[in-house]
Design a protein with these regions (language model features):
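Flexible, low-complexity junctional segments that flank or bridge functional domains
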Residues: 22-70, 79, 113, 118, ...
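Cleft-lining beta-strand/loop regions that shape enzyme active-site pockets
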Residues: 60, 67-190, 199, 321-449, ...
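Cysteine-centered motifs
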Residues: 10-12
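C-terminal long alpha-helix characteristic of the crotonase
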Residues: 249-250, 282-327, 440, 498-504, ...
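Charged, glycine-interspersed solvent-exposed loop segments at helix/strand-loop junctions
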Residues: 190, 194-293, 447-529, 533-534, ...
Length: 622
């Protein structure tokens, strides 16, 4: 209670008290009313949804001859989206704001194999990606679609850079008369809060191993360290060069020419006709002309309707999937690695890898005699070292019974690499971010604020020297001695990490240390230093798993089940609930610009006494 009160005082110090309290009660009242209404109508919606589930289970999309699959490059795309509500279909909702990479790739493959689907239309150009490798995998799937001899047409009012990278695979790219392409190269700025904390009297203390382990720097420095600049420059240049090469091949221009366009001018403000001259697009076109272009490809009259299929439609198209042969399990582990998902949801975090839950799932796969091999799909920048070790141990036990092949997604770094290292074989996408072999602990000390500025002092008794070490760390004036023990604890954790990688990858500990030190690596570079075995896709990982298990005929099943949309509302001991995430939204609106630093404080207070195996905190491209 005392520490909670002190955190409240911290918040009051950095905000205007009257405004905060007024807004708090207003929003609390609105939240209570919203929850009451939610409880009243839930029963009604559940009834309708159950009827919708029955209807959707018994029906599938019928594909008409001469159809077009429309993929809208808007919203966001991530590793795996949660199951949608049956109400979507009943209410005629055909837009999916968050797209699962697994879903869209599955739909593209269905379209490739379906004779009635003649092509794909990519509409829009502002799709957000959780990682560079996610965009690369979507583009690769579209590239594979074209091998069937079918066409792809793309059109947008404007193209964000990474969406253009995806769309560049199309046979023809069209742009609105007043459209723009935001081609400018990769880059961005990171926030550093030390100056703010200095003014508040808050000091962050870091215990870490790894000169490249930069996660702590946003709280301990006022600018980027040379080591962090080095690693960020390396992986961003690698990703950008890969994107340039792919775009240049598709658009039949030189990569150097594209780079020059991004380097010499702000393409977002260019005249659309300049894009045609630069061969970035094929034609400046008005929206109503798109249909005419597609009808020409379909060889239908201008008055005929185009049979369109959305992503939702394609997901409901029956697959020609063959369930014969042995089973290979594909287990998805994506998001931050946590001990409990409740805290993550309260802070507005996305999907998480819960240590205990994931370890239990992997043990079940180990005991399932029907599963002959496992592909462990990892897309994580790490998190709790304790949870990471739980999962790693489960992977090791699984490997003792059947082959385990890791398929790395957008990132498999720090804790993500920790849980990957015991596998028989590691396959990574060319633009996967991996490595980050390092450990840290991060503790905020509030004595400068609470004692020096607010006048709160502390006194007490104890039976032993360090009985109150946790309070001394956070509120004491001289926590240096305790931090020495904290550093020793982190040092041991790093040595454990080195041993884990050494045993898993067959590399000497000294060599692991030389390529470790918290440094992130692009997968194409990680291949050269033996952190991964092959650059390839999830399909390549499945083929390798079948090879190791000596399977001639096999089929794949995905785990864990996505669960129904109803599950999102139900509280769980480890996973939290929908209402938890709603509380986060209320606090974010209340705190405004102060939300990020205060949530950082909250998280480090919660996790600071534990080792963290977490990579640098922002690897998105835009």
């Amino acid at each position: 209670m005392r520490f909670t009160f002190l955190l409240y005082l911290c918040s009051c110090y950095v905000t205007i008290n009257h405004f905060i309290m007024k807004q708090f009660f207003k929003m609390t009242f609105a939240t209570v009313c919203g929850i009451a209404i939610f409880l009243v109508v839930t029963g009604f919606f559940l009834t309708i949804s159950l009827l919708g589930m029955v209807a959707s289970d018994s029906a599938s999309t019928k594909v008409k001859d001469n159809s077009v699959f429309v993929i809208k490059l808007n919203g966001n795309i991530e590793e795996r989206a949660s199951a949608g509500s049956p109400l979507d279909e009943l209410l005629g909702v055909d837009e999916i704001s968050t797209i699962g990479l697994d879903d869209v790739i599955s739909a593209i493959r269905k379209a490739k194999d379906n004779e009635d689907i003649k092509g794909i239309y990519l509409e829009g150009g502002s799709l957000g990606f959780d990682a560079p490798a996610t965009a690369q995998q979507l583009r690769d799937a579209l590239k594979d679609f074209k091998k069937s001899g079918k066409w792809i047409v793309a059109s947008a009012n404007q193209y964000h850079q990474v969406s253009y990278y995806v769309a560049s695979v199309a046979d023809n790219i069209y742009l609105n008369d007043h459209g723009a392409i935001d081609l400018r190269g990769l880059g961005g700025k990171r926030e550093y809060y030390k100056g703010l904390y200095d003014k508040l009297g808050i000091k962050y203390m870091a215990a870490k191993v790894g000169k490249y382990k930069s996660y702590v720097e946003s709280n301990t420095l006022t600018g980027m360290s040379d080591y962090d600049r080095e690693q960020r420059t390396a992986y961003q240049n690698g990703i950008w060069n890969y994107m340039l090469k792919e775009m240049a091949e598709s658009r039949k221009v030189k990569a150097e020419a594209l780079n020059q366009l991004a380097n010499d001018s702000i393409m977002a403000f260019a005249d659309p006709n300049d894009y045609v001259k630069a061969r970035l697009i094929d034609k400046v076109i008005f929206p109503e002309e798109i249909k005419a272009e597609i009808k020409k490809r379909l060889k239908i009259d201008k008055d005929d309707d185009i049979h369109q299929l959305t992503l939702s439609d394609m997901l409901n198209v029956k697959s020609e999937k063959d369930d014969d042969g042995d089973k290979i399990a594909i287990y998805y582990a994506y998001g931050s690695i946590v001990d409990s998902e409740t805290i993550n949801k309260l802070q507005g975090g996305g999907h998480s890898i819960v240590g205990k839950t994931t370890a239990e799932d992997l043990r079940k796969l180990a005991d399932d005699d029907d599963v002959k091999a496992v592909v462990f799909r990892v897309n994580s920048g790490g998190g709790s070292a304790v949870a990471s070790e739980q999962i790693r141990h489960a992977v090791k036990l699984l490997k003792a019974k059947k082959p385990v092949v890791v398929s790395m997604g957008g990132a498999a770094a720090s804790g993500g690499y920790w849980i990957s290292s015991p596998a028989n074989y590691i396959v990574a996408e060319p633009t996967t971010i991996t490595g980050s072999i390092g450990i840290f602990g991060l503790i905020p000390n509030f004595s400068g604020l609470v004692t020096d500025k607010l006048g709160v002092t502390f006194d007490g008794v104890k039976t032993n020297k360090f009985s109150d070490y946790d309070e001394e760390l956070i509120l004491g004036k001289n926590p240096d001695e305790i931090m020495k023990y904290m550093q020793t604890y982190v040092d041991k954790g790093y040595q454990q990490f080195l041993t884990i990688v050494s045993e898993g990858r067959g590399i000497k500990p000294a060599e692991v240390d030389s390529i470790g030190q918290g440094r992130v690596w692009l997968a194409s570079d990680a291949l050269k230093i033996k952190l991964v075995d092959k650059l390839g896709s999830l399909d390549d990982a499945v083929k390798k798993a079948a090879e190791l298990a000596k399977l001639k005929e096999y089929h794949c099943e995905t785990y864990p089940n996505k669960g129904s949309w109803i599950d999102q509302f139900m509280p769980d001991e480890d996973k939290g609930s929908y209402l938890d995430s709603q509380l986060h939204k209320e606090f974010k609106a209340l705190l405004g610009d102060l939300y990020e630093p205060l949530m950082e404080i909250r998280q480090t207070v919660k996790e600071g006494s534990r080792m963290q195996a977490r990579m640098l905190d922002d690897v998105r491209v835009k």
